Amino acid sequence: MKKSIIAFPRIGSNRELKFALEKYFRKEISEDELQIVAKELRLESWKSQKEAGIDYPISNDFSFYDQTLDLSIALGVIPERYKKLKLNELDTLFALARGFQDEENDVKARPMKKWFNTNYHYIVPEISKETVIKANFSKLLNEYQEAKTAGFETRPTIIGPYTFLILADYLSGVTEDAILSDLIGAYTILFDQLNNLGGEWLQIEEPALVLDQTEEEQQLFIKIYQELLKNKNKLRVLLQTYFGDLRNSYQEIIKLDFDGIGLDFVEGRESVKLVQKYGFPKNKLLFAGVVNGKNIWRNHYQKTLSLLKDLGNIDNIVINTSCSLQHVPVTTENETKLSKEILNHFAFAKEKLVEVSEISEIYVKKNTSLLDKNIALFDKNRVQENIQLKQKIIHLTDKDFIRTPSLVERRADQIKALNLPLLPTTTIGSFPQTPEIRKSRLQYKRGELSKSDYEAFLEEKIKECLELQENIGLDVLVHGEFERNDMVEYFGEQLDGYIFTQKAWVQSYGTRCVKPPIVWGDITRPQAMTVRWSAYAQSQTSKPVKGMLTGPVTILNWSFPREDISLKESTLQLALAVQEEVLDLEKSGVKIIQIDEAALREKLPLRRSDWYSEYLDWAIPAFRLVHSKVKAETQIHTHMCYSEFEDIIPSIDAMDADVISFEASRSQLSIIDALKAHHFQTLVGPGVYDIHSPRIPSSQEIKIQLEKILNKLPIEQVWVNPDCGLKTRGNKETIPSLTHLVEATKEVRKGKITYDK
């Protein structure tokens, strides 16, 4: 029985890629030096896979920024405004991802969206009338040859043409038909080139197959591959799917001339039933995704073996991961502070390679010692249940999820209490974390800085931040979040039920890596988490200062959750803990409390029919539970970013927040039309500039954004803010950008323009 994975993390076990890229962006290293780091990371990945017994090591899973963006470059799908910059290929890629600004040019970054239901983000391809497909697969081919030279016969992977078409933005009435023929031709060229190099396999990733499909989309997929697979010659082609099942198209797909088909048996609820009902062709390999590529818990071998048995008499099975391992940390080897007893329960990417091999060995060779060891791990009670918390959740009633008075009724109380101007200006929460701030936090964690000295340092930084905001002229201030390393980890560290790693980093986008905390047991709040800093900040100014919290859904979605209880139960535990914090903030005199739900959409099922019953029916009430007990005059804000929200607008309105800020600038404010169409009741702050790009927007640019918003929404409904928190930016970008934001807002206010609503 062969052993395989879909892809391996590319960031390095110590985030080597992140740090090399940041040096390159600062012009501290050359492209050649950056490429050396990349080559070392690829070699390490292939070695790890081979040493673990993986039969099909993967190439072309490496990317400097994003694999979808790599494909756009390979296909020549580069909008004209980026070509005009006349940059080399790598810098063009970075311009698409980050924007580009110099004395002569000012180009915004392409929109960034969540990769299906993960916390990874992809750069959205843009198709226009000017788009001309021009194949250049040098990256894939070079990395395949690089591996071969190093002694590894790899299976290159690439995102497929169907998924590319589904994910792309189409401008000016253009449809996929405009590029379909050339797109198929480009992949045909890749087949020929890989054949000429002696390539054995090509993995084509088509995760869009697990989404709801129209009849037209099913036919589009079939049309693409009936044509494409005619040209594979000796090359064997694996269709790799993940994040769900193929219930719309399984019967048709197994008829196509693929040599292997990869199915997800972790998130694909119907995958086993599909194989049982319709069978699996004897002339194809079934790449069975049975090792969870998204979570960090050890595989339960008994359950996996039982699942494989349920597939029936299929001889041609390859043990595989359920998705790319880029969604989990690289290895547990660097975790020196967690006990062996705890680490035994975890499998990061390198450990999952071993799991793939062990499952194969147990299945084929009946290795009972490996199986017995795994069974013993799951036979123990890992945590003790909190009975009191369980009872509290059981006895929640409908009233616990409803805030009174209603949204419209309490708005008058808030207007009176806050006395804000039209178009109130604010930020999303965090301010730039300078090397000095990071150094002090690290010194405090290491015991090199006393608590009193560290707190005095933070108070000074908060004062500076408040003074800066007042000088700029913002209406609602924030304390800057200098005490926080991460918007989820910070809270998890103060909640019972969480455990933390040292180096369990996962890529979110580009150079942005996150270290998700792990939900180990039942979650409770032993003491106040943020009141100390929010209350201090409010005492330093007469302007309102927002209390800043992360919401329960986002905390869970950006953690590695338990697998022994439901996501709903874990979320309600978190909601009760955050509710306690909200009430303590209110008691301390904080009048505006922001409860971020940046990741609300992240666990939304990929199929619309499952949205409510499996997610929204408990995720939205969990948010309402958090703020249901606050006073009418306390204003509740929330923030959301980097997802598609247009199709769940009614659910977002049902969160019953008073103000919601959205990421909107990269997506050309497209969410505004949806808000207007759904008669959105909540006050809104669509982000007027993109903070994930280093470029600085002008006052005029922000004014134009505001005018677009006010052409569709009443001025009384609109707040003015950036897209997201400013933590990852520098002061040299933040200060002028916010200054321009306030200047533009004042100009619009002064103009007293009558807008067509």
Swiss-Prot record:
Query: Where does this protein hold 5-methyltetrahydropteroyltri-L-glutamate?
Result: R15, E16, L17, K18, K114, R512, C513, W558, E602
* Cofactor(s) required for function per UniProt: Zn(2+)
Binding positions (L-methionine)? I428, G429, S430, E481, D596
Q: What residues sit in the active site?
A: H692
Q: Name one GO molecular function term.
A: zinc ion binding
Annotated positions binding L-homocysteine? I428, G429, S430, E481, D596
| Membrane-spanning ranges | none
- GO BP: methionine biosynthetic process; methylation
Quote the SUPFAM superfamilies the UniProt record gives.
Answer: UROD/MetE-like
Tell me what reaction this enzyme catalyses. Answer: 5-methyltetrahydropteroyltri-L-glutamate + L-homocysteine = tetrahydropteroyltri-L-glutamate + L-methionine
Report the cofactor remark. Binds 1 zinc ion per subunit.
Identify the pathway.
Answer: Amino-acid biosynthesis; L-methionine biosynthesis via de novo pathway; L-methionine from L-homocysteine (MetE route): step 1/1
Arranged from A to Z, the UniProt key words for this protein are: Amino-acid biosynthesis, Metal-binding, Methionine biosynthesis, Methyltransferase, Repeat, Transferase, Zinc
Which parts of the sequence bind Zn(2+)? H639, C641, E663, C724
- What Enzyme Commission number(s) apply to this enzyme? 2.1.1.14
Q: Which domain of life is it from?
A: Bacteria
Q: Which family does it belong to?
A: Belongs to the vitamin-B12 independent methionine synthase family.
PANTHER family, per this entry?
5-METHYLTETRAHYDROPTEROYLTRIGLUTAMATE--HOMOCYSTEINE METHYLTRANSFERASE
The record, for NCBIfam families, names: met_syn_B12ind (TIGR01371), PRK05222.1 (NF003556)
Q: What does the UniProt function comment say about this protein?
A: Catalyzes the transfer of a methyl group from 5-methyltetrahydrofolate to homocysteine resulting in methionine formation.
Name of the protein in its database record: 5-methyltetrahydropteroyltriglutamate--homocysteine methyltransferase
Source species taxonomy: Bacteria, Bacillati, Bacillota, Bacilli, Lactobacillales
